[in-house]
């Protein structure tokens, strides 16, 4: 019985120390609407580190890592080779339920925030983010310099869908911070999870989460909803429109 009480007390004390700092955050816009002429935008994440009496007196400097993840989906990266003057697909790798959008921001270089072991465990930096692949009949994440993984990240980065910036987080005061979240024109639709992790003297202190949503509006959304919810009606209307277009074209261009 005494051991159980001591264990419970230890858990309580650990929980109390873990709550020595509390993160309070918010996003400038929790619902982003995408119209046909949407060209991208930048959201602003801002927040503060709230201390309490149990915060160590010598803890005055903090580090922050912000991770933004879009809706997850299966994706494929293909290897092309030139044979007989023609580029053909020779191999491919499937990535399973990986973020369609992924951004990591910090207030200083990731390798100066914490140790490599903690960085791997907390997935700090693109090289440490888990990207599960189908390798033959197995599922695994591979080494960061794997050719398919490197190509996948490079292609997503070129489209503005994957990024990391070790200077994007700014501390306005020792405890008040902000960062921008750039969204490209082709940003995927869905719910985006934002995870904010707090470090001090290389140690992981705690984290908090928030989210925002990207939705289509207007005629595009109406068409998408109709196709998803009433597939038969959508197919019939599409076929009718195609027939009408062909009929009108035959009238306009027919020879008298």
Label each PLM-derived region with a short phrase.
Residues 7-15:
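Bacterial N-terminal signal peptides
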Residues 232-256:
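Juxtamembrane interface at the cytosolic side of transmembrane helices
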Residues 186-216:
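Extended, hydrophilic extramembrane loops/domains of integral membrane proteins
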Residues 182, 205-235:
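Short, aromatic-rich amphipathic segments at membrane interfaces
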Residues 49-53:
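Short solvent-exposed capping/turn motifs at the termini of beta-strands
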Residues 16-20:
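Sec/Tat signal peptide C-region and signal peptidase I cleavage site
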Residues 21-36:
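N-terminal edge beta-strand
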Residues 82-184, 188:
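Membrane-proximal low-complexity regions enriched in glycine and acidic/polar residues
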């Amino acid at each position: 019985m005494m051991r159980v009480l001591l264990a419970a007390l230890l858990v309580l004390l650990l929980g109390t120390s873990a709550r020595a700092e509390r993160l309070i955050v918010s996003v400038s816009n929790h619902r982003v609407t995408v119209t046909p002429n949407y060209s991208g935008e930048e959201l602003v994440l801002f927040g503060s580190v709230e201390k309490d009496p149990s915060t160590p007196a010598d803890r005055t400097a903090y580090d922050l890592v912000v991770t933004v993840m879009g809706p997850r989906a299966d994706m494929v990266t293909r290897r092309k080779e030139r044979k007989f003057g023609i580029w053909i697909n020779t191999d491919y790798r499937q990535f399973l339920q990986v973020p369609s959008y992924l951004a990591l921001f910090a207030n200083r270089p990731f390798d100066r925030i914490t140790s490599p072991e903690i960085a791997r465990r907390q997935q700090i930096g693109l090289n440490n983010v888990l990207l599960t692949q189908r390798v033959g009949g197995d599922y695994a994440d591979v080494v960061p310099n794997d050719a398919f993984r490197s190509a996948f990240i490079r292609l997503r980065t070129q489209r503005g869908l994957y990024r990391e910036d070790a200077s994007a987080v700014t501390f306005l005061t020792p405890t008040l911070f902000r960062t921008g979240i750039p969204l490209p024109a082709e940003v995927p639709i869905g719910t985006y999870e934002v995870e904010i992790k707090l470090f001090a003297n290389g140690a992981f202190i705690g984290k908090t989460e928030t989210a925002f949503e990207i939705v289509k509006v207007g005629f595009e959304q109406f068409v998408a909803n109709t196709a998803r919810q009433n597939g038969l009606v959508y197919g019939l209307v599409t076929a009718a429109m195609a027939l009408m277009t062909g009929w009108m074209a035959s009238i306009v261009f027919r020879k008298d």
